[in-house]
Amino acid sequence: MNQDTIAAISTGMTNSGIGIVRISGSEALEIADRVYKGKEMITEVPTHTIHYGHIMDGDETVDEVLVMVMHGPRTFTGEDTVEINCHGGTYVVSRVLETVLKAGARPAEPGEFTKRAFLNGKMDLSQAEAVIDVITSENEYALQSSISQLKGSVKNRIKEIREKIIYHTAFIETALDDPEHISVDGYGEVLKEAAEEVIDQLKELIDSSDDGRIMKEGIQTVILGKPNAGKSSLLNILAGHDRAIVTDIEGTTRDVLEEQIRLQGLTLNIIDTAGIRQTDDIVEKMGVDKAKEYAKEADLIIYVVDASRNLDENDEKIFDLIYDKRTVILLNKSDLDTVVTEEMIRERISQKGVQKQIPVIAISAKEEQGIKELENTVKAMFLKGDLSFNEEVYITNARQKNALVNARESMKKVIFSIDAGMPEDFYSIDLMDAYESLGNITGESIGEDLVNEIFSKFCMGK
């Protein structure tokens, strides 16, 4: 990696109150001195101090600024760092950066500041990946999970598991090198118990990835129902604006409508679908087929029943789509005379052989009644109703999950080798495979190409 001094704009490229140009590297202070005019030289002021002055391009004043000076290694990157706080217009920030680059800095690559923090030991790879997750978080849970990982929750848990693995690996290797003084007789049972404990810990982390994905990507939510059941009205209420056209004409929604909403700290990626019914209209039929496809991939199905009309064969088709999904059934139009009851719905569910308890809620989309109960029910169905980031660790990253799965498979091989009575060096091989897989999460067992690929996904200036 280049150790030259880099610079980039660290704030968004939009007109705003303040813009920040960050400089990091061995010559950050000297380069800042070449463009900064104030009462004192940047190279002479104490670390972690802020100074008022101007950025100069020769004799021309570019902007009035506050400059933050930080000496390494007590910085984000571990290097000498200067952050120039200027006015936030896109042109003036670009001019400040241009002036800094003319003074000797190199334009930073995407994610290069965080990459340097990783390479300089300021954070491990799981924490580095959490940086981008903080930036891209779209709800409270995603943010808190990312902050927890940035503070070292994943790093510490992986470190704990790796220490157990390397302890047993070291014992076996030492015993094989010095059999006269160290015996491995009976050690297989000790190792098997330890391996089973590690597998349980890995399983817990792997299982957390489902919650992690939902926190990060949102709940894929599909609204199903017959035509004119009130699906589009429900979407409009949840979205807080008129996203869908609502009429008394059946089949108004022919294609899918997508909307992202925030619900009590969660993100719902909602898809409003065409009403499920038998139709000869080619376009509407395509919409119905699409609705069925989306239902298969959904994390959550909200089935809207028009409680003022009797159930029919179209409802039977919808019941077939929801039996293996997390589902909330809404008895809509509770403000009218209703003919469909919760008992009738539960009887239909029972006839389908569904054992799980499906929430059934009476609502009126027209009067906006029952919506709060729907929100509370959805939250309770996901993330155990609420989450604690004090002790729980959540995996939100597919790369990390794959590494955990690989480590678990290696530990299963250890147990297989023990049960099969294979030589102890077989145990050691699989233990080290698990150790290396977990090292991929923290970055201790990862190649330069993968490091470059990970950081290339970061935004400029971070």
Spans of model-derived segments:
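Generic enzyme active-site microenvironment
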Residues: I270, V304, L330
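Conserved beta-strand segments of alpha/beta enzyme cores
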Residues: R106, T267-N269, P359
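Switch I (G2) and immediately adjacent beta-strands of P-loop GTPase domains
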Residues: H51-D63, V67-H71, G251-T279, E297-L300
